[in-house]
Amino acid sequence: MAVFISSSGSPGRATATTTTTTTLLLAVLAAAAAAGLLLAPVAARGSPPEHDKQLQLQQQEDDRIPGLPGQPNGVAFGMYGGYVTIDDNNGRALYYWFQEADTADPAAAPLVLWLNGGPGCSSIGLGAMQELGPFRVHTNGESLLLNEYAWNKAANILFAESPAGVVFSYSNTSSDLSMGDDKMAQDTYTFLVKWFERFPHYNYREFYIAGESGHFIPQLSQVVYRNRNNSPFINFQGLLVSSGLTNDHEDMIGMFELWWHHGLISDETRDSGLKVCPGTSFMHPTPECTEVWNKALAEQGNINPYTIYTPTCDREPSPYQRRFWAPHGRAAPPPLMLPPYDPCAVFNSINYLNLPEVQTALHANVSGIVEYPWTVCSNTIFDQWGQAADDLLPVYRELIQAGLRVWVYSGDTDSVVPVSSTRRSLAALELPVKTSWYPWYMAPTEREVGGWSVQYEGLTYVSPSGAGHLVPVHRPAQAFLLFKQFLKGEPMPAEEKNDILLPSEKAPFY
């Protein structure tokens, strides 16, 4: 019902007609109000109506995690966890675990989304529990230890289990488990939009996307950037890519080169691999490449490909290893963790996250819809993965052209996505070099090299010394420094020039 009132007459002239009209208007408005037909006042542009604000606050409070089983004392930061529905029709929802910044002024700290790749591996079980999260799982699988180098000491960290089908995240529609790169990026963007609607006070924070996936991170970054003018506003500033496949052709060459240079494969296998594998897909390799790859794995023996110079776990293989071996028909030991050194650390996380009281505290699997035991990676997602880009260089060019902060890093003991692969792929971008390859240190006065770096126009590459595929696992201090430098937009610290000795100035070895 709409009521339109028109009046005539000059201002300041009260007549019987206007008096009657006013009386009639008041009567009509009173009747409309009594019938509930009047609309509420329109809220200010950009501000949700009051009842929406109350709903947001209630959702936040419902997601608040007061504490976790076995949690140590001294935890001063807030935590939230729960589900964000991204498709009502299919019943598709992603799980998240959010940790507020453990800083003097968390309200001023940036927001960082962390994703693990695989595809199909858990950002909670790997990223949060083994790499950069505030806790480490004790060897008893029931209690937690504080992580001295937790990344939430510099930023608010949001871990998301994506896509649906990765452990706690789920869908009521089985076809949703057949994923691909583009669908993954769009689903995760939808998650972000809805998460920001639930936590609107983070909309204008500096926002970054980070993780261990050369596909998920740049592809999601591209979607976020292209939707920069849509609502809600996301203050997207840059991306941090770890150990990521970038260009299948260059990555494949770099892989066989590293295997050979480290004495892991024969001359014949290197030559065969360089002949038949470049140009094939990592996710869907040709039979010819698979045959050579299997020969290479047999020659390597029982090593951990994610960190080739550390001992392997003597327990059953972890699902995480299938990301590397499964396309070629072989399993291998699980990823490692330092410090303290524990080659079977992944099983501590598996035990802890399967405890019913832990899942209850995390607000995970509250309906019991996830019937299978929690595991670090989803074989279903990995085995059914479809569309996978073979070249991410055009995406990088677009993001660099947009002026976003772009950093890439990888460990030098990783044989899965080795330094040689990443450097070849980045070289293919043909970016001008701002600062040539140099050693960096944990502080300008440190004598021991922390790693190496090169700065291009629009992109920075960092290689922490002695790190494997999961850089924060093996070199947590270096990884944390790298993260802080990335957030500040500052290069890795170089040693003062006058502290560097030329070969002629060094003492003899005898």
From Swiss-Prot:
EC class (word): lyase
The protein's name: P-(S)-hydroxymandelonitrile lyase
Glycan attachment positions: N172, N365
EC nos: 4.1.2.11
Organism of this sequence: Sorghum bicolor (Sorghum)
Residues spanning the signal sequence: 1-34
A molecular function GO annotation: hydroxymandelonitrile lyase activity
Swiss-Prot/TrEMBL catalytic activity: (S)-4-hydroxymandelonitrile = 4-hydroxybenzaldehyde + hydrogen cyanide
Active-site positions on this chain: S213, D414, H469
A matching Pfam family: Peptidase_S10
UniProt KW Cell cycle keyword: no
Tissue expression notes: Primary leaves of seedlings.
Subunit organization: Heterotetramer of two A and two B chains. The A and B chains are linked by a disulfide bond.
